[in-house]
Regions:
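Active-site region of chymotrypsin-like
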Residues: 19-29, 54-112, 120, 125, ...
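PDZ/PDZ-like peptide-tail recognition elements
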Residues: 32, 62, 124-166
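PDZ/PDZ-like domain segments forming the peptide/carboxylate-binding groove
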Residues: 83-84, 88, 92-93, 146-195
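PDZ domains, with a preference for the canonical peptide-binding region formed by the helix
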Residues: 178, 189-227
């Protein structure tokens, strides 16, 4: 017998409690690792197609990026692999070098050897979130923004000598930045991450992803620093 303790539709994750005494006897917990590198080998464990024997498929990490999950319009960090992920594999661990680097997420219909997994930072965020007995979800800036690719537009805003900065077009109601930023500001940095004009940050050397990577590394109540350009200052 098992019961669902917590569920996150935005992450497509759930925490399940097994009530049977001794269910985990003889097992050893798997340790989490960080985000795998491109070309790292991975193995995905699961029970596809309703089988009763453990299936292991192997492949490599193709890319790490931000993309939409199944049940949300928000983009979160996601890993892509050429290891087969079939129905029934979802929720299985993705293992690299003996440690968990993610949770099998889905395959792309109509495409062979393309599967996706939820990287451990998202899984850990979910687990840390529910430690207090409540699920709060992922923090959001609550802004509408646009890229600043045009040299003339950048000059008008005072950021012509750098490639960083995105234009704030609107602050949504109840945004944590509602009384701090305003329309027309140029958002330059979050914490120590410079935001490129296309809205990306370098999350590790020579690899970029959506600037929300920085926001989504936080839990509610944690400090997030920002740097802006306003009126060319």
């Amino acid at each position: 017998k098992a019961s669902v303790e917590f569920i996150s539709e935005e992450y497509d994750l759930a925490l399940i409690k097994v009530d049977e005494p001794g269910f985990f006897n003889g097992t050893v917990p798997l340790k989490f690792s960080g985000i795998p590198m491109n070309r790292d080998k991975v193995a995905i464990y699961g029970y596809p197609m309703g089988g009763d024997k453990l299936s292991i498929t192997e492949g490599i990490v193709s890319r790490i990026e931000h993309s939409k999950y199944t049940l949300t319009t928000e983009k979160f960090l996601i890993g892509q692999t050429d290891a087969a992920i079939n129905p029934g594999n979802s929720g299985g661990p993705v293992i690299s070098k003996g440690k968990v680097v993610g949770v099998a997420f889905s395959g792309l219909l109509g495409a062979d050897n393309i599967g996706y997994f939820i990287p451990t930072p998202i899984v850990e965020h979910f687990l840390n979130d529910i430690k207090d007995g409540n699920y709060d979800g992922m923090p959001k800036l609550g802004i509408i923004w646009s890229e600043l690719e045009s040299p003339s537009h950048r000059k008008m805003l005072g950021v012509e000598n750098t490639s960083t900065g995105i234009l704030i077009k609107k602050i949504k109601k109840n945004s944590p930045l509602e009384n701090m930023l305003k329309k027309g500001d140029v958002l330059l940095k979050l914490d120590n991450y410079s935001i490129e004009y296309d809205g990306t940050v370098e999350f590790r050397k020579n690899e970029r992803t959506d600037f929300n990577y920085v926001v989504q590394s936080k839990n509610f109540g944690e400090l997030l620093r920002y740097e802006i350009m306003r009126d060319k200052k």
